[in-house]
Amino acid sequence: MPLKLTNTLTRRTETFSSLKPGEVSIYCCGVTVYDLCHLGHARSYIVWDVLRRYFIAQGYKVKFVQNFTDIDDKILARASKENCTMNEVSERNIEEFHRDMDALGILRPDRMPRATRCLEEIKSMIEELEKKGAAYSAEGDVYFAVMKHANYGKLSKRDLSEQQLNADGRVTDKEEARKQNPFDFALWKAAKEGEQSFPSPWGAGRPGWHIECSAMVLQELGETIDIHLGGADLIFPHHENEIAQSEVANGKKLAKYWLHNGMVNVGGQKMSKSLGNFTTIRALLKEGISAMTLRLFILQAHYRKPLDFTKESLDAASTGWKRLNVILCLGLMKHQTLNWPKPNIQESKITSLSKHSLNETLNLSRQQFIDALNNDINTSVAISILFELARPLRSLSNQIENGSSELISESDKHTSYSRWLLLTELANVLGLQAELPKTRTSKQSQNLDEVLIREAIQERKDAKLSGDFAKADKIREELNLKGVQLIDKKDGVTEWIQS
């Protein structure tokens, strides 16, 4: 089964075919850097990170470009509020963006252009649109005439009579009055008094939001690219306007495939800063929710569907991740006990999905995983396959933790290693990587009730002595879900560490 992707432009699920064999050019709309990112941003960048990882695993040479919008009304407003420059606001929040994305295990884009660094390209594109009669100036502003693009509305599938005026909320009443058509949009905005600005043939000002992305796509990837990515909230007007200005300026199709992820919802409403119902990535991580829990939470739903954010759904993802993480850590922590090769503890390299020769059962699991991602990047099904692969390894883990590793046959050790290796490689395609438990320190111990833990360990020991191994396993599992991992020593002593 070849890779199939749902193309917003055609509303069809299509077989993917790149413009150049073996290469993929991808542009992803980035953030406006005026504040910390929230879970909605995390969803976009995690799902597109998986798409990129999958292309790499399939042997493609990928060029992935993601921009920073560092010129915007929101940034200017924040700079005014904090009595600093627009650049200071942008630089600080770009650093914070990298901190969050790195924490989530998201691969850094190959290129991350900024609007402030491609102003000449932006102005050149506006001048080209003027030459073609698709742009006009009015009181220092420059607007794109939407009627000059014959297929305006082809992405959002709306005609102008159905469009909502000022859908992005970035246009003032005065700007509306200067337009020839209510749906024309700004390519260049004249500077207001005292506002940071940039020189241009039309006077001091700054570029409009949409033209920034069009210019950066052209600068970094060329006139036509394979895939353009973004959230569903960007379909109109942002991506619709990108298409219009790029295709008029360049005379060519902007992107072959348009992919859009669904929104994260809170109480039935889209998570957004404007509604005030957002939770930042930083806040979630500070609460002790692991980065991999957030990845699993996001990837358990299909990327195009809405994702409801609730405490219960996040707790369920946390429980699931802890179960999976124990198995992913197995080869990193117990390889000597199992006579497995010593693994590279550093971040795993994305490997080819057809690299290893496997037995029939494991080969089937690998193919099912590939088929799931080929089916419009169905990470929900792909994750279920990871848990299926992990299940037989759980009994192996239990035997080690119960101090009975000598009962594991050499044949089982060998077969289990192949299974574990495949599991880690497939998990890495989803960006799910083992989080090794931290060794317990006196400071960390203060966050856990050690008396209760010792009592639980003794209760487990008594259960094992009485032959009630089911109860012993249940106690160990309950402690594990609370972030406590038990280590049974050969002398009968059980130690614990905080994971």
Swiss-Prot record:
Top-rank lineage group of the source organism: Bacteria
Keywords from the named record: Aminoacyl-tRNA synthetase, ATP-binding, Cytoplasm, Ligase, Metal-binding, Nucleotide-binding, Protein biosynthesis, Zinc
Q: Name one GO cellular component term.
A: cytosol
Keyword hit for Protein biosynthesis: yes
- Biological source species: Prochlorococcus marinus (strain SARG / CCMP1375 / SS120)
Q: Where is this motif: 'KMSKS' region?
A: 270-274
- Annotated residues that bind ATP are located at K273
Tell me the classification of the organism that encodes this protein.
Answer: Bacteria, Bacillati, Cyanobacteriota, Cyanophyceae, Synechococcales
- The listed location of motif 'HIGH' region is 31-41
Record-annotated residues binding Zn(2+)? C29, C213, H238, E242
Q: List where in the cell it is found.
A: Cytoplasm
Among HAMAP family, the record links this protein to: Cys_tRNA_synth
Q: What is its EC number?
A: 6.1.1.16
**Name by which UniProt lists this protein:** Cysteine--tRNA ligase
GO MF annotations in UniProt = ATP binding; cysteine-tRNA ligase activity; zinc ion binding
Family assignment from sequence similarity: Belongs to the class-I aminoacyl-tRNA synthetase family.
What is the enzyme's main class? ligase
